[in-house]
Curated annotation (Swiss-Prot):
Nucleotide-binding listed as a keyword: yes
Binding site for ATP: G7, L8, D9, G10, S11, G12, K13, T14
GO cellular component, one term: cytoplasm
Enzyme Commission numbers on file: 2.7.4.9
Protein's gene: tmk
Single GO molecular function: ATP binding
Protein name: Probable thymidylate kinase
Family membership noted in the UniProt record: Belongs to the thymidylate kinase family.
Source organism per UniProt: Haloarcula marismortui (strain ATCC 43049 / DSM 3752 / JCM 8966 / VKM B-1809)
The UniProt record lists the keyword Transferase: yes
């Protein structure tokens, strides 16, 4: 089973992911992973994040290459072994974030749909996605707005994209209010994964 943690920067995904890694109730053979990865593909993605002038289409394909390698090297092998995979960010992040970035380019009528179409023939959709829901202003404040992906204006478009994804596949998504206290958020995410 592939479970993904999604949400705006500052929503608490990584904090929850770290807590799950040390939770004795989570099966010991669980594979914990994340995107961008720690590979050279992920390093290229990180360089693009840090570059305010990165071309949005080129950036999409860096993320896509990282995702393809992640699937072939980590996700699919673990799933083939029958293991639970929990990923801190996955394809929905790319759809939401790169869809928002491409929206600013004026090149695409529906950037979110374009990004999904690029992935449709080969990606492995999650079985369940836990979406940590947070308003863009709080997300920008929590994340420190240190790069181009963390401003409230940009995160508003990202959140709108996540809402479109949830509307298109409501059975897969579990929405968790990320404004709740951290222990409550964790327990809700944990229940969504283990129940």
């Amino acid at each position: 089973m592939l479970v993904t943690l999604e949400g705006l920067d500052g929503s608490g995904k990584t904090t929850v992911w770290e807590r799950l890694r040390s939770d004795d109730a989570v099966p010991s053979e669980t594979v914990f992973t994340r995107e961008p990865t720690d590979t050279w593909y992920g390093d290229a993605v990180q360089r693009s994040i840090d570059n305010d002038d990165a071309d949005s289409l080129a950036e999409l394909f860096l993320y896509t290459a990282d995702h393809a390698a992640h699937l072939s090297e980590t996700v699919r092998p673990a799933l083939n072994e029958g293991r639970l995979v929990v990923s801190d960010r996955y394809s929905d992040s790319r759809y939401a974030y790169q869809g928002a970035t491409l929206a600013g380019s004026g090149t695409f009528d529906d950037p979110l749909s374009y990004v999904r179409e690029v992935h449709a023939p080969w990606t492995r959709p999650p079985d369940r996605t836990v979406y940590l829901d947070l308003d863009p202003e709080t997300a920008a404040r929590r994340s420190g707005a240190t790069n181009k992906f963390e401003t409230a204006e940009y995160l508003t478009t990202v959140r709108d994209n996540y809402e479109r994804l949830i509307e298109a596949d409501p059975e897969r998504f579990v929405r968790v209010d990320a404004t709740a206290d951290p222990d409550t958020v964790y327990e809700r995410v944990r229940a969504a994964i283990l129940d």
